[in-house]
Amino acid sequence: MKSLRALLTTALSILTLQRTATVTGATVDMANFASNKAVFVPGVLTDGVHTPSVTESDAAASGFTAVAAADLDGALAVLASNVPQSVGYIGSKRYLRLVITTTGGPATGLNAGAHVEQGNSRKIP
């Protein structure tokens, strides 16, 4: 058996916290990686509707738009308690931001976070 530790990197986008409002994650630069997977990790959901999505841009600070379904390997659904979801990104933009859109005016919401797993580094140490 072989370890993937040296072959993969994890870039945190959304810190795991209790969510009662929409959150847009930190920008993730994909310049040095040929493979990227967005991972949403929900904990206990008490109320509200929490929908994950992936946005992309050519610029680090602006111009983010929703990733087209054709540029995702897989699909995302409304988050449920303790059910992680992931999609591969096969688009051509350099930057990603993960988003959890919250509706329904939750009182306590959802404990959730998200990250991007990156592999196939273009720069091997």
Language model regions located:
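Long, hydrophobic N-terminal alpha-helical segment
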Residues: 2-41
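Noncatalytic modules at the cell exterior or secretory-pathway interfaces
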Residues: 34-39, 89-107
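Coiled-coil-like amphipathic alpha-helices with heptad-repeat character
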Residues: 14, 89-92, 117
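Surface-exposed ligand/attachment interfaces on beta-rich extracellular proteins
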Residues: 17-31, 44-69, 76-83, 106-107
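Generic structural motif
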Residues: 52, 98, 112-114
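Short secondary-structure boundary segments
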Residues: 1-12, 45-47, 51-52, 95
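C-terminal interaction-tip segments
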Residues: 1-12, 102-125
